[in-house]
Design a protein with these regions (language model features):
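RecB-family 4Fe-4S metal-dependent nuclease core
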Residues: 1-289
Length: 289
């Protein structure tokens, strides 16, 4: 029976987390601190950088084309960064923060000099969080926020554009664009004729991607989502590395052990923590010689 309040909601980030480490997925997406009844979130410098840049660039899609650059983008970035400065962004020293902030400023300057699709018509899906029923029978919903939809008036079609702030390129097996393609096809009426990444850290132009087959993508994603639902029903989310953990779940285990510092709550009331890696090394991580 389908019920969006009891359904399993899956997204690109939650599916990726599950595939990397079921334990990490559980701690990041399902677990709630019994003391606060809030989910937990770990803030880090790369996450802060991505959040600040995305906030600036994505906000432009809500503004009319001829007014998008009326306010200097670097001023917008400065406002976004202030919310993430210091420990709020996972920065424990000024030098590290300066490096990340400078990278963010360079990305914004790149957008100013080479606005590309940001200077053209865009489509905004009228949903705070685009979603659709991946399977009503299995009570599974697919959701996700799309960075940018470029509109082509001649063909009345759209191009999905995803902004990347990481220095690493997405692999060919990434499910991100296939998921976004499904969402856009189900949440608005225009055909998707192109998909691209924009690597803001290194490129002035879009990097086109192959348009995935909708049916094949949906079948693949539903298969993974069913595994996620089964493991949730069993309450079984084990790390592939066993009790020693992995890079995906260890940082969240540190929160549970009281080794992380609480810095506040995000817009969704999650408890946000930061981890100073240099001060949280356990004795087993070092040897006295």
């Amino acid at each position: 029976m389908s019920d969006k309040y009891t359904a399993l909601w899956v997204s690109h980030s939650s599916i990726s987390a599950f595939l990397e480490c079921p334990r990490g997925y559980f701690l990041k997406n399902i677990y709630k601190d019994p003391k606060t009844n809030h989910k937990i979130k770990l803030m880090s410098p790369p996450l802060a950088l991505g959040q600040a840049v995305h906030e600036v660039v994505e906000s432009l899609s809500e503004i009319k084309t001829d007014l998008r650059f009326s306010e200097p983008l670097l001023d917008k970035f400065e406002r976004s960064w202030k919310k993430l400065s210091g420990k709020n962004g996972g920065f424990f020293d000024k030098e590290t923060e300066f490096k990340y902030k400078s990278r963010g400023e360079e990305m914004v300057r790149r957008v100013i000099k080479n606005p590309g699709p940001l200077n053209e018509l865009a489509v905004k899906i009228n949903m705070d969080l685009p979603y659709y029923w991946l399977s009503e029978e299995d009570n599974i919903i697919l959701c996700g926020k799309i960075d940018w939809l470029k509109y082509y008036p001649d063909s009345d079609s759209v191009e999905i554009i995803d902004f990347k702030t990481s220095r690493h390129e997405e692999g060919e097996d990434s499910l991100q664009l296939p998921i976004y393609n499904l969402l856009v096809n189900h949440c608005q009426n225009r055909e998707v004729t192109a998909l691209s990444y924009w690597y803001l850290d290194s490129s002035d132009e879009l990097t086109p991607q192959k348009v995935p087959n909708l049916k094949e993508a949906e079948e693949k994603i539903l298969k993974i989502a069913k595994r996620m639902k089964l493991q949730k029903s069993l309450g079984k989310f084990d790390c592939p590395n066993g009790e020693s953990g992995c890079r995906a779940c260890r940082p969240f285990e540190s929160i549970l052990k009281g080794e992380a510092e609480f810095v506040g709550n995000d817009d969704f009331k999650a408890d946000v923590y930061v981890l100073n890696k240099t001060s949280t090394l356990s004795e087993k991580d070092s040897t006295i010689l």
